[in-house]
Amino acid sequence: MANQKRGRQSFILPDPPVITHWASVAGKKESEGPLAHTFDIKSQDTYFGQKTWEQGEKQMQKLALGKLAEKAGMKMDDFDLVFSGDLLNQCIGSSFTLRNLGIPHLGLYGACSTMAESLLLSSMAVGGGFADNAVAMTSSHFASSERQYRFPLGYGGQRTPTAQWTVTGSGAALVRSDGHGPRITGCTVGTVTDLGIKDANNMGAAMAPAAYATIKAHFDDMKTAPEDFDLIVTGDLGQLGKEMLLELARRDGVSLGGKLTDCGTMVFDNDKQDVHAGGSGCGCSAITLCGYLLGQLNGGKLKKILFCGTGALLSPTSTQQGLPIPGVCHAVCIAGGT
């Protein structure tokens, strides 16, 4: 019997797993933004010492995992599981990072929802007694994403006002059965939502319906409400997607009010950095969570947040064939450190 299941999509964790350590790696533009002081490793080299941007993204995950192990006082052999993914075809950023390390690995593709998805699965593995610890990790890179999903940088294509800037960064979090730190008390698994948005330069619009569907499901399943949280944090809707989410909630009689924020509007200073509609990418929510948010929770400045990773489930092939962009969102409830 699924004793921990709540409603249609959610579950609780009676013995909440603990996020004991976290690490973040940020690129040049991200290191010039308002959250720069919260990142562990900051690089001015977009290649991270490698020959290609794709190899640079692999290097970011390697740095994040290494920093996580260092902070936790652990060796690679001490990790029971790694849940990770990225935006590169076949998730080569993650698999190349972990090759020959001997760590059991489950690769994920949730697009930009991957940080929340990996955290959700880590909490299930640890909370269910299948592992003593698990690592949730992801990354993205502006240049590799532009080349894969839109146009190579050398093409010089104009960006539309609705376009977002893919974050160059990687985040890793260690989830354990005991210890001190923020605790994961419950999660909501998202459903794939498709309202027919086809513009690959307007992913906030494609993801906003999925974000609202998951947030509403969490409220319904867990018998909770916006006022029960200090923040409701979406992954990378950007400014436009955030406004659409607020409107969807208003139409349904739900006031998210001053509770809602979005990692895509936090990681950059849009007035100074000109990222159009905001940040995006797996790394957007990853470095915001593993830099700023977990630090605030651990320090007691935030008591409880609903972390909602949002993903646009497109591919180059689906875009070229004119197909719409499905969205997904997974929610993780994180309570302050003890």
Regions found by a protein language model. Give the residues of each.
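Acidic, glycine-rich active-site loops and adjacent beta-strand->loop/helix elements
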Residues: 85-90, 112-113, 138-144, 190-192, ...
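Short, well-ordered amphipathic alpha-helical segments that serve as non-catalytic structural scaffolds
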Residues: 57-73, 119-121, 206-221, 288-293
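Active-site-adjacent elements of ketosynthase-type condensing enzymes
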Residues: 86-102, 142-155, 241-242, 288, ...
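Condensing-enzyme catalytic core mediating Claisen C-C bond formation in acyl metabolism
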Residues: 1-54, 152-216, 221-224, 255-274, ...
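Short glycine/threonine-rich loop-to-helix capping motif typified by GTGT followed
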Residues: 95-98, 237-252, 317-325
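Active-site-proximal alpha-helical scaffold in enzymes
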Residues: 109-136, 175, 280-301
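Conserved beta-ketoacyl condensing-enzyme motif
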Residues: 19, 54-112, 228-243
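Internal helical hairpin/lid segments
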Residues: 232-294
